[in-house]
């Protein structure tokens, strides 16, 4: 079955589209990518998305027009990736504007902006969208949803395997081994903390918007990370919350960056970027240390996906700090890093079409199996 997946993440840099052919057992599918397309948001759209996500108040008219524009851009990406409309289903995540983690006294919340019925009619195809609301209604965080699909896409090894996504936010999937006493264990997943969100903001600020990200980690590699400050940051209570846990740009965004910059004082942009990038690697390393400390789980391999996997400085820091773990890009096992999340939502859309529910208890914390996504027919 052919499915088109559309994804735009918390980095808000654009839309990734992937056309996939799925066959076989939905839990262990065979899949083949037939085409891909990536659309970069115009700077005006990206700025508006980030500003609204950071709390900018806009009128109802502006809100509607932003939703229409994002929907139309997703339609453009879909048509470009699948010009003959061969997909039986189109799965579209929409653009996240706000995410609220579950608190003891308050349910979680997550807002993705997309007009699903409009997209279905623009494409004249079945659309699956609104993937997070059922999970949240069932007491879950609604994130990280990629962890629900990773095992099906990458499979198991003879030891514990991790999949790390480095988008705006870093999240981890922990996949049990295929043999031994742990083979009946559950797949785990959680949001770790900031990845590209802080670094991208800092790069833009420190270069007066001449750069929007640290390509290949070139700026970070010229700086010296402030390790004492990083050790202090790692004591943030969020990093000690037991999974399932989730977060977003509203927690690790502009205001958080300003607070951390104040603590760092007057330092060069290279030292700033190096410190923030090393901070991300340290968060992951601390999570893996705690995974062994509290659950006696030690990874043999960590596959890295997302834009951060192209950051050579960050990849070196991960290998340095995650002792005894083989760290490598997910591309090396045939999963295209840039399109992994689009592939995930294509998979969830395929499962929705088939009526396949997923048990998210150990990943999002939702209390019952869920059929992810809402179907709209044209």
UniProtKB/Swiss-Prot annotation:
Pathway: Amino-sugar metabolism; 1,6-anhydro-N-acetylmuramate degradation; Cell wall biogenesis; peptidoglycan recycling. It holds the Pfam family AnmK. Its EC number is 2.7.1.170. InterPro entries: Anhydro_N_Ac-Mur_kinase (IPR005338), ATPase_NBD (IPR043129). One of its GO terms (biological process) is peptidoglycan turnover. Keywords: ATP-binding, Carbohydrate metabolism, Kinase, Nucleotide-binding, Transferase. One of its GO terms (molecular function) is phosphotransferase activity, alcohol group as acceptor. ATP binds at residues 9-16. It catalyses: 1,6-anhydro-N-acetyl-beta-muramate + ATP + H2O = N-acetyl-D-muramate 6-phosphate + ADP + H(+). Catalyzes the specific phosphorylation of 1,6-anhydro-N-acetylmuramic acid (anhMurNAc) with the simultaneous cleavage of the 1,6-anhydro ring, generating MurNAc-6-P. Is required for the utilization of anhMurNAc either imported from the medium or derived from its own cell wall murein, and thus plays a role in cell wall recycling. Belongs to the anhydro-N-acetylmuramic acid kinase family. This is Anhydro-N-acetylmuramic acid kinase. The gene is anmK.
